[in-house]
Amino acid sequence: MEKKITVIKGDGIGPEIVTEAQKVLDKVAEKFGHKFVYTDILMGGCSIDKYGVPLTDEAVEIAKNSDAVLLGSIGGNTSTSPWYKLAPNLRPEAGLLKIRKELGLFANLRPANLYPELREACPLKDDIIGDGFDMMIMRELTGGLYFGARKTENVDGVETAVDTLTYNENEIRRIAIRGFDIAMKRRKKVTSVDKANVLDSSRLWRKVVN
């Protein structure tokens, strides 16, 4: 099997951890007879330093034409880095939002596992831990607050910031389907978390998921 992997080392510890991850992939390729072809692109602060933008259109096209993306770390110290003196759409994290949108990466999967042998290291109560737990937490990535309209303005002499939380039923449905598909391979249980007692977006979320 031959696969093309776009490598984004990014900023901070990104280059260090991605280099080690590539070593692991190389061992996998060696053991199972695969071939991984790596193409490096810049994203985040390192791209700003070289090109003046957090992610170029050319880099996006390379990622689109690959089978997978290996991503390190994006951004730096928000208090000291000159990147954060730029307009919000030119800061490192804007590149991350752009590539998520362009590649349709709407579902963030975060496994949470605790094995019985590690229960003493967990801050949760014993009656919650039981014999350990194995959860998959899924977060929607390309809708909601991160992609809604935003503005900062002066209202009656008071500086006011507005972020718009927007979801449509298609965005909700696709991540719900992904959650159900994953659950069918696990314990066949899905818990949808919302704030339907307050938010219209959550009421729509609950309506679609249910």
Q: Which residue ranges define each predicted feature?
A:
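Extreme N-terminal starter segment of soluble prokaryotic enzymes
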Residues: 1-5
